[in-house]
């Protein structure tokens, strides 16, 4: 048997049938990585042929391999390309982190913790594995892969998307609604409809930008957050409208899901295709025959409303504070209450339609502006001697006394609003910060209050006969 390695191959001599000279092994040996580095042009036979194809493909837009290729293929591609053509053979590179098991150990046959990709896809679906690898975590970091982790991303995002599609399909059929039925113009729909469509346009724009920059994680995060907003805020807040067959709600959810499905297609091609066929092709015979033949969502006629985005974000923060206030008082949301008072920058300018969303969500008759929070909360401010001691040393007792001399609500509100409060200590001005004081707030009897930064919600707990 011929051994093609040195030194045995050195003894091999081949007689040339044409020139009758003897051919021996070339004594110089080039690094085998040169072949890999020459791949972009050698695979095409360039420069002897395929010049036009080479010009279209070189340099490549993107390359990815594991971190160990930094000194291997990544380097040889860059070195050979730069040497021959004066530029690297790729524009963008990602060094993938290693795949670990769920306990953070390197996968190995010895440990018996190797997960084969095909059985993993058979269990969870190819799209679940794709979504996990593309969207959950930075690709350059080591990643723990296991059944639990993949099942979790399916539950939180893909299943939520699927259930929202099923919800739309069910209520559209019940109302005998289709896109051909028509709906009011976007600007004539309720603000919550305008908001969710504005955010859909924002998602299309931002996911497009993320994918153009090869950042699948950012694009996936944007999609996951929007799917959660769509299901757990828009659909939940609009549920009664769907029960009533409201055309505006049905059209809005259909349009939002259309955008989401197109944006999901590069991540989850099989689920997106199934939804495209069942929800969009089934209701529009002019739609492309596949989601993968459809155009990316057009922003030409879309409106991205930043003010509405900020207003809805404020509404949702106030709702969270209201829920926290109710939870603190052990009064469940099922119990109607008379009023909620809100103190927050921008609240007084909020449209009545969005204020009504808060009232309905918190199950109160009215929501009003909270004029003076101190009237509903007993505030106690104590010096934080540990933090004060770090700054003032032996002068800490004097500073602590100056803190206790200030009206508590005034001091607490100032620190909350601006981050500090100026005190006069022995004729000198000293700033007190949030870490320097311990603030305790207790609602007055009959009220429950929750606060965060500059925003507060107070709920009246008095229940009259009607309530």
List each language-model region with its residue ranges.
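Active-site loop segments of alpha/beta catalytic cores
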Residues: 138
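Structured mid-domain segments that build the active-site/substrate or prosthetic-cofactor binding neighborhood
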Residues: 132-135
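Feature 926 captures the class I aminoacyl-tRNA synthetase adenylation module centered on the KMSKS loop
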Residues: 1-34, 38-40, 46, 84-126, ...
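Substrate-binding cleft of carbohydrate-active enzyme catalytic domains
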Residues: 79-80
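Cytochrome P450 heme-binding Cys-pocket and its upstream "meander" loop
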Residues: 45-54
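N-terminal catalytic cores of NTP/NDP-binding nucleotidyl/phosphoryl-transfer enzymes
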Residues: 63-73
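Glycine/charged-rich beta-loop-alpha catalytic/anionic-binding loops adjacent to active sites
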Residues: 54-61
């Amino acid at each position: 048997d011929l051994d093609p390695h040195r030194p045995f191959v050195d003894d091999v001599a081949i007689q040339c049938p044409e020139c009758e000279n003897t051919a021996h092994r070339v004594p110089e040996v080039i690094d085998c990585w040169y072949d890999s580095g020459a791949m972009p042009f050698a695979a095409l036979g360039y420069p002897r042929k395929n010049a036009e194809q080479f010009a279209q493909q070189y340099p490549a837009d993107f390359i990815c391999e594991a971190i160990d290729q930094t000194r291997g293929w990544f380097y040889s591609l860059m070195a050979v390309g730069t040497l021959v053509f004066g530029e690297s053979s790729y524009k963008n590179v990602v060094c993938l982190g290693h795949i670990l098991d769920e306990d953070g150990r390197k996968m190995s046959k010895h440990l018996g913790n190797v997960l084969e990709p095909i059985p993993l896809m058979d269990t969870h679906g190819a799209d679940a594995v794709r979504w996990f690898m593309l969207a959950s975590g930075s690709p350059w970091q080591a990643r723990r892969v296991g059944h639990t982790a993949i099942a979790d991303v399916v539950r939180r995002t893909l299943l939520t998307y699927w259930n929202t599609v099923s919800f739309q399909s069910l209520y559209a059929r019940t109302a005998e609604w289709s896109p051909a039925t028509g709906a009011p113009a976007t600007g004539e729909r309720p603000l919550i409809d305008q908001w969710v469509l504005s955010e859909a346009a924002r998602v299309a724009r931002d996911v497009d930008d993320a994918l153009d920059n090869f950042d699948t994680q950012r694009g996936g995060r944007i999609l996951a957050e929007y799917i959660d907003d769509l299901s757990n805020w828009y659909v939940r807040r609009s549920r009664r409208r769907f029960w009533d067959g409201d055309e505006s709600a049905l059209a809005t959810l259909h349009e939002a899901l259309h955008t989401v499905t197109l944006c999901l297609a590069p991540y989850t091609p099989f689920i997106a295709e199934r939804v495209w066929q069942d929800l969009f092709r089934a209701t529009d015979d002019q739609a492309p025959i596949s989601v993968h033949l459809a155009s990316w969502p057009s922003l030409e006629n879309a409106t991205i409303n930043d003010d509405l985005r900020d207003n809805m974000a404020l509404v949702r923060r106030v709702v969270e504070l209201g829920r926290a206030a109710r939870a603190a008082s052990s009064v469940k949301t099922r119990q109607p209450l008379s009023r909620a008072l809100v103190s927050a920058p921008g609240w007084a300018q909020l449209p009545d339609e969005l204020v009504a969303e808060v009232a309905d969500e918190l199950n109160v008759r009215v929501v009003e502006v909270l004029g003076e929070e101190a009237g509903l909360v007993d505030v106690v401010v104590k010096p934080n001697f540990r933090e004060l001691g770090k700054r003032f040393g032996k002068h800490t007792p004097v500073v602590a006394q100056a803190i206790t001399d200030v009206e508590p609500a005034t001091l607490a509100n100032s620190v909350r609003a601006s981050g500090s409060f100026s005190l006069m200590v022995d004729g000198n001005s000293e700033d007190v910060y949030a870490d320097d004081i311990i603030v305790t707030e207790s609602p007055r009897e009959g009220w429950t209050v929750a606060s965060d930064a500059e925003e507060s919600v107070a709920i009246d707990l008095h229940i009259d006969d009607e309530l």
